[in-house]
Structures are given as C-alpha cells and as structure tokens.
Curated annotation (Swiss-Prot):
Pfam families: PEPcase. It catalyses: oxaloacetate + phosphate = phosphoenolpyruvate + hydrogencarbonate. Its cofactor is Mg(2+). It comes from Histophilus somni (strain 129Pt). The lineage of its organism: Bacteria, Pseudomonadati, Pseudomonadota, Gammaproteobacteria, Pasteurellales. This is Phosphoenolpyruvate carboxylase. It comes from the Bacteria. Belongs to the PEPCase type 1 family. Forms oxaloacetate, a four-carbon dicarboxylic acid source for the tricarboxylic acid cycle. Transmembrane segments: none annotated.
Length: 879
C-alpha cells in the first residue's frame, strides 16, 4: 500500500484488532480462532491456493447454525469498519496535505487562470452556481440508524487520534472509547426487526441534515469564498445559495402505498418543527454573542433605541422560534393548539430580514469580522434550508392520474378518458385548464385510489409557495400526462404555479422526450404558465433495466442534448434533473466524472440530482465529507460551463448508435429472450429472500405477481450485486464494443476513449464493475443453488464476462483492471478477503433455507440477512 495511505492501513488494523477483542470477550476465544482461521484461508484462497480454498469451503459448510451468526457478523462488521476508515481518509488532515486533488475547486480556479479565462466570466458563472441534491428513501441503506450514530462517533475518534500533540493519557482514553463504540455496535442487532415506515425514513433524512448538512453548507460557502478571494479578489454574495436540498422522503408515492396524503402532511410538519428547532439553537448562540452596542441610524430607527440593539432583535426572534417549535410540536403530538399562528414564524423572510439587517449594520459600522461569523452562517442556512428544512418533491406514476381522470369523465358522462386519442386528451385538458368553472362534481364520491390522488393535491394547495418544489410524473410518455397533473392541481385549489416534471425512464420514452416537450411548448396555455422555465427528469434506473447500460447511457445523452437544443430554440430555461442511483446499473459514477461526461450546455442552469440510499451516508454523512462532495460537484459544474467538453464527432455518434443497438439486442436477448432467464435469476441470486429484508418502506415490486419486468430497478441491481456477477452493469456493453472493433472500428473507439468524456467515463465505469465481479464465486452460487439444466446460462454469462474484461483491457492497453487507480484496486483486494467468506456463507445459508422452506431456522434466516448487509458493505455501491 502506498506510503500516503499508511494512516488508513493503520486505522483499519487498529479497528480490526479492537473488533477481535470485542468478539473474544463476547463469544469466547474459540469463535475468534474460527473467524481468524476463515480469514487466513480466504486470504490464501485469493492468492491462488487451491487447498486453502477447499478447506475454506469445507469449514464454512460445516459451521453449526449456532455459530454461523457470530461468524457472519464478524466479517460484516469488519467491512463496515473498513468503510468508516476509508471515509475518514478522504477528510484526514494528513491525506489532504499529501494528496492535492486536481478535481477540487482550488485546482480548477488555478487552471482557469492559467488558461486565461476572464475573471468576470468565472465570477458570473459562480454566481449562477446551483447544486440541488434530492434526498431519497430508496431501500439501499442497509445500515440501521442505531449503528450510524456509533459509526459517526468512531469517525470523530479517528479524527482526534490524528493530532500529534496528544498525551499518552488522551490517546489511551480515545482508544478506549473506540473499543466501547465497537463493542456497542457488536451488541446491537444490525438487522431491523421490521420495515421502516415513511415517517421513520423521514426522520433518517432529517437526521442527515441535522448531524451533517447543517454544518456542511456554511462551511462549504466559506471555503468557496476563500478560493474566490484568493484567486479573483471577490466574495460570494450572502444572498446566493449555491447548495440547496429537496427530498422525496414522504413525497414519493410511486409504487409505495404507505406514502399517503396524511404521510406527506405529517412529514412537512416534522420538517418545519425540526427547522425551527435548529434555527432556535443558532439564535440562542447569536443572542449570547451579539452584545455589540453600535449600529447604524437606519437600524436604530427600524428596531428602536436600545443599549444592545442586535441582542434585542435576536431575542425577539428567539421568542418567536420558541413558539414555533411548540406550535408544530403540538400538531405532531395531536394536541389542541394553544399558540396563535400570528406569534410564530411561517415565512423565511420573517427570519431573514431582521438578521440581514443586523449583518448590514455590523458591516457598515466596521464590524465585518463579527458579521461574517455565526451570523453569516445562519443567513446561509436560511437561504439553503429555510423554515421548511428542505423542499419536498411529490412523485406519482402517470397511470394513476389517467385512472383518476377516467373516473371523473365517466361520472360526468364524457366516456373513458384513458381510451381517448392523445389529441382528444390534450384538447379536453386545455379546455378545462382554461375554464373558470370546476370540473369535479359537488356530490361525487371517488374511489379510494382517486380520493388519495386528489387529497395529495389538496395537501399541496395548503402549503405556502415554495415548500413543494415540484410534482414529478414517473413513466411520463405524453404531453397529456403533464397537462393532466396541472388540471388535478387546479381542481384541488392550487393557486400558485407548481412545476410539473415529466420523468422519462424507458428507452422509448427517452427517445420520444423531445417530441413530447415540443408538443407541450406549442400549447399556448402551457407556455403562458411556465414563465419560460422547464424541468425535465432523466431516469437512469429503469432505462438501464429496460435496455442495458450502454443503450440507456446513449439514450440519456441524446435526450439531454435534444432537450437542451429545443429549449434554447424555444427560449425556455431548462433544468435537467438526474435520477441516478449509486451503482453503475442505475446511472452511478464518480460525481466529477459523471458531470463532465454530460452533453455541452446541459449544466448551465445548475445541477439537480438524486442522492440515494447508502450514497447519502458515504457522500453526505459527515460535515467534512459533505463539504468535499459539494466541492467536487461545484468544480465539475463550473468546469463543464467554463471549459465545456467537445461536441461529439459524427463518426463517434455513428459508433454510439451502433453500440446502442447491438448492446440493447444482446441485453434483451438474455433478459427477455431466454425463457430460462427468470428461473435462473431467482435461483442464482437471493432475489426472493431480499424481499424479507426490512429495508425501505416501499415494496420491491410494482406488481407483486409479476416477473423481472415488475421488479424495481433497485432490488434488481442489489440481487446481482450479491452473487458477484453484477450483470445489469455490463451485459451487452463490452460485447457490442468487441463487435464494433471486429468490424474495424478500433482506432475510432480508442479516439473516443481518449477525447470524449462521455465515452471514457463509461469505459471507466465498466472497469470498476469488472474489478468487483468474481466468476468463481458466481459459479459457486450456480453449482449449489441452481438446477443443473440451467447451468448453461450461468456458464454462458461468465464466458461473456471474461471476454468483456479482455475487451476493456485491450482498450486501456493494460494487463490488470484499475491499474491507473492502484489504491482502488488494493481496496477491492482487501475487501475481497472479508467479502468472500460472506458470499460462501450466503450460498450455504440459501441452500439450507431452500431445502426446508416450510420450516426455516430463525438463526439461518438471521445469518442470511447479515450476509446480505455485509456484502452490501463490501461492495459499497449497493443500489
């Protein structure tokens, strides 16, 4: 391991040693010896020792049901501790001093100056910078909140241990605390006993904001200001908010019957209660600090003549915030309200104006150093979080709106809306949107499904403008899908304009997105209400599941490119909303590389992107880590706008069209065309058992009785991740490249790798995926869990995988995967020693459970769940 990572290696060894001591104390030395023996055998097996591999298999297959849980837990917990150490490494002071990232804002500003980009252009681009991260509750965060708090505390201990001036006593005390935390984690059940409710998920999202983002946002703004002042002699305006947050948690009802209108209402109140509580804590600190006596005459005239004028203003705000916290607390506890709404804060401006006046007065009185302290941090938080804490997106599937309108049109005697032609639907919707009379009959009683749709729209109508950020239509296919939601909102009493966002998800829908938006922009009523602003969401998960990674990636690129060109032509300001997951099969990639691979001009109005599942913890879970993530996002957006990527050559486009078609055909010939694929998938992976894992609140299938096509993209990816074949992330992609090379296109493809960020990023993503696959482990799943007559399919897929790896290596002119990123290769190699036993244990556990499905052993079920979470920790990007 390189010298610069010696701190990481030492931390991993220390945490592993403490875990071993904990296990010995809790389970006895015999269990620890067994675990250590398995670890050594796994290490030797990875080194090619066949006898060690045979002994490893024999040892794991003969473990008693009683001992299998502590063994599984040991390897799972070590992988979690490794993740903590690796996450800390990114913010370690020693690491930052040694490794200056060329992807950072600081490096970008220096590069911009070196390339003589005008300072005015840089500053104006920074002023438009917007990073909007949308937190989602997708069921990929397998780590319980009870453990997350302990993991954060472990990280803090590692930070304190890094100080060189610690006394022996201080160092011993910190290490003892680490041992306590690891022991607490060991004695905590890592598997939830029941699925979280949407409200539980919302509490998890609120905790991320409270424990990390609340501090990270003003810290990042300070860091941005330092870079601007150092390089261009200016500072970012206090009025600007480069980072904002929205959430789907409590608003995303697509396929989740547990997210109701009442859920949304409750989550909105919870958010406001927590925001008031957090601002109250800030204001209390300000109240203690702002004992300053000098202020401007304007300030004194506005707020009165007081000895400590700022403290009086802040104390008034504190009194209102105390009542605001109490008011929303009573609502959450279903108590009758004792507080007048005139006495609470309901609008951001009520908090912003007096504090901004304090800020201005302090500046004008020569107290800039005071103004730019805690007060400035508070102002930044108002601009970012506001009194709603985060904006809430509403999401629902298009078919649900169609069914609701069909119910209405049938009742009023117009026939079945769902059976009408698209032109007729649009004509009806535009006529009703333009009409002053209501559409809904006064005495009509809708079905429960339609009632829920309408009640959700009424909840939206009750919110102040800006609290709900947008209404997203999943599986959007037509212009009428968008107009239908506008009509339902109008009928529910929404009087302000709420952006309605079509989400184009499948290959066909992405390809048709330009035509759909053209139709909408040509509707006079629509152009009149959108104020020349439009958001469109690009779906990564379902398009990749539908057509494979390569075809989906190209369809996403072309759709964005066409939408950018269309909106520029029509004079519409376009915001592209990226629905990415953490894995390659769901659009995931390192943030910086992913953004620089976007089409030119697609980021000029900022970035809006989902942060999903476990990626929220890895990228945003600690303040310093979140600041790093913001920095990477910001540098990539600014670089894309100031040093845009090249327009792809026509020859590159021709190759991509060919790769898209051939990769899609290869992918679908397996996933859809082979009659044995579904039974193979269900037996070769723990897909059926995954449904028992109490992860998120949302069911794993849209249709409980359906096949793979009804399976959501997340469990689809998760299942293949478990058996190390990782099929959705690569099937069809490299094979299509190989076919193109065989046709004589190698030189062009190598040129694309070198000069086109879109293509080189895809190749890099494939290389990362391939480095995590394992054909021997995948075969082991087949030989023990799959019927013999289906073995041919697994063998064929593994042969494809091996051929695909050779293709990628031939393009990179390397002998080994990830040779240009040796640390990642080493990290994967280290993890494999601990992940391999979990994979082998999982096979044994699945075999035992499937042999006796009517009477499953609870210990075996529990151990299986632990292997699933442990492998997820080992693979990092699970969904």
């Amino acid at each position: 391991m390189p010298q610069k990572y010696s701190t990481l290696k030492n931390n991993i060894n220390m945490l592993g040693h403490f875990l071993g001591e904990t296990i010995s104390d809790a389970q006895g030395s015999d269990i620890l010896d067994l675990i250590e023996n398995i670890r050594v055998l796994s290490r030797d097996s990875r080194s090619g020792d066949e006898k060690a591999r045979e002994k490893l298999l024999d040892t794991l297959s003969t473990i008693s049901n009683e001992n299998i849980i502590p063994v599984a837990r040991a390897f799972s917990q070590f992988l979690n501790l490794t993740n903590i150490a690796e996450q800390y490494q990114t913010i370690s002071r020693k690491h930052i001093d040694q490794v200056a990232s060329d992807r950072s804002l600081e490096a970008l500003f220096e590069r911009l100056k070196a390339q003589n980009v005008p300072a005015e252009k840089v500053i104006s681009t920074v002023e438009k910078l917007l990073i909007e991260l949308v937190l989602t509750a997708h069921p990929t965060e397998v780590t319980r909140r009870s453990l997350l708090h302990k993991y954060v505390e472990i990280n803090r201990c590692l930070s304190r241990l890094e100080h060189d001036d610690l006394t022996q006593s201080e160092s011993t005390k910190l290490k003892r605390r680490l041992m306590q935390l690891i022991a607490l984690a060991w004695h905590t059940n890592e598997i939830r006993t029941q699925r979280p409710t949407p409200v539980d998920e919302a509490k998890w999202g609120i905790a991320v904001i409270e424990n990390s983002l609340w501090k990270a946002v003003p810290d990042f703004c300070r860091q941005l200001n330092l870079h601007l002042e150092k390089n261009f002699g200016v500072q970012h305006s206090v009025n600007l908010a480069p980072v904002k947050f929205s959430s789907w948690i409590g608003g995303d009802r697509d396929g989740n019957p547990f997210v109701t209108a009442e859920t949304t209402r409750q989550v909105l109140i919870m958010n406001r209660w927590k925001a008031a509580e957090l601002f109250l804590a800030d204001i209390q600190v300000l109240s203690e600090e702002l004992s300053v006596v000098h202020c401007t005459e304007e300030f004194r005239a506005k707020y009165g003549d007081h000895l400590e004028p700022y403290r009086v203003v802040v104390k008034n705000l504190r009194a209102k915030l105390v009542k605001t916290v109490a008011y929303y607390g009573e609502i959450l506890e279903n108590k009758p309200s004792t507080i007048n709404t005139n006495d609470i804060l309901t609008d951001d401006q009520q908090l912003w104006e007096p504090l901004y006046d304090c800020y201005q007065s302090l500046h004008q009185c020569g107290m800039r150093i005071i103004a730019n302290g805690i007060l400035l941090d508070c102002l930044r938080r108002i601009r970012c979080f506001g009194l709603s804490l985060s904006h809430l997106d509403i999401r629902q599937e298009s078919l649900r709106h169609t069914k609701a309108l069909s119910e209405i049109t049938r009742y009023i005697g117009l026939g079945d809306y769902s059976q009408w032609m698209e032109d007729d639907k649009q004509a009806f919707l535009i006529r009703e949107l333009s009409s002053r009379r209501p559409l809904l009959p006064r005495n009509w009683t809708p079905s429960l499904e339609t009632q829920e749709i309408l009640e959700t729209c009424r909840v939206i109508a009750q919110q102040p403008e800006g609290v709900i950020s947008c209404y997203i239509i999943s599986m959007a296919r037509t212009a009428s899908d968008v107009l239908a939601v506008h009509l339902l909102l109008k009928e529910a009493g929404v009087t302000y304009y709420l952006p309605v966002v079509p989400l184009f998800e499948t290959l066909d829908d992405l390809n048709a997105s330009k035509e759909v938006m053209t139709q909408l922009f040509n509707v006079g009523w629509y152009r009149g209400v959108i104020n020349n602003k439009q958001m469109v969401m690009i779906g990564y998960s379902d398009s990749a599941k539908d057509a494979g990674m390569m075809a989906a990636s190209w369809a996403q690129y072309r759709a964005q490119e066409q939408l950018v060109n269309l909106c520029e032509k029509m004079g519409v300001e376009l915001t592209l909303f990226h629905g990415r997951g953490g894995t390659i099969g769901r659009g995931g990639a390192p943030a910086h590389a992913a953004l620089l691979s976007q089409p030119p001009r697609s980021l000029k109005n900022g970035l809006r992107v989902t942060e999903q599942g476990e990626m929220i913890r890895f990228k945003l879970g600690l303040p310093a880590v979140a600041v790093n993530s913001f920095d990477l996002y910001a540098s990539a957006i600014l670089e894309a706008n100031l040093l845009p990527p090249p327009e792809p050559k026509e020859s590159w486009r021709a190759i991509m069209n060919e790769l898209s078609d051939s990769s899609c055909n290869i992918y679908r010939s397996v996933v859809r065309g082979d009659k044995d694929f579904v039974p193979y998938f269900r037996s070769a992976t723990p897909e059926q058992e995954l449904s028992k894992l109490p992860l998120g609140s949302r069911p794993s299938k849209r249709n409980p009785n359906g096949g793979v096509e009804s399976l959501r993209a997340i469990p689809w990816i998760f299942a293949w991740m478990q058996n190390r074949l990782m099929l959705p992330a690569w099937l069809g992609a490299s094979a299509s490249i190989r076919q193109s090379i065989e046709k004589g296109n190698k030189e062009t493809i190598e040129e694309m790798c070198k000069n086109w960020p879109f293509f080189s990023t895809r190749i890099g993503m494939l290389e990362m995926v391939f480095s995590k696959t394992d054909t021997w482990l995948s075969e082991h799943y087949d030989l023990n869990l799959v019927k013999k007559e289906l073995w041919y399919l697994g063998q064929s897929l593994r042969e494809q995988l091996q051929a695909d790896i050779k293709t990628i290596l031939s393009l990179s002119h390397e002998d080994e995967l990830m040779s240009d990123l040796p640390w990642i290769a080493e990290s994967i190699a280290l993890r494999n020693i601990y992940t391999d036993p979990l994979n082998l244990l999982q096979v044994e556990l699945l075999r035992r459970l499937r042999e006796n499905p009517e009477n499953p052993n609870p210990d075996v079920e529990q151990a299986l769940m632990i292997t699933i979470t442990g492998i997820a920790a080992g693979m990092r990007n699970t969904g």
